[in-house]
Amino acid sequence: MKVVRILLLLLSAVCGLSLYAAQSDLDRLDGYVARRAEYVARKQHSIDRIKAQLRPSMTAVERLAIYDRLFEAYYTFRFDSAMVYVKRGSQLAESAHNSYFQDNFRIHQGLLLATSGYYS
């Protein structure tokens, strides 16, 4: 009988610790959610720095590399913007006859559509 009481006491202590840990994780998550605007601003600033590298005098390959970086930056951030750079990159790669970037942007498009639920 003593063993059962000890086991119940230990079990209740472990459950209490588990609930405390779960609440601590939720509090930490709430802190991250509260700082959402800061994270969005930081991400947008990073994207703006990449966009600022675009110049009219760039070669097609240089422009394609930047479109690729913009896709990567937008991929988990904004679906529509990521798709814009996939389409721009695909069109430029096709007109420049660059098979590497044609394939690369096809893969990006498939990945983007599949992860957003637009697959068939």
Predicted regions located by residue number:
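N-terminal secretory signal peptides that target proteins for export/translocation
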Residues: 1-3
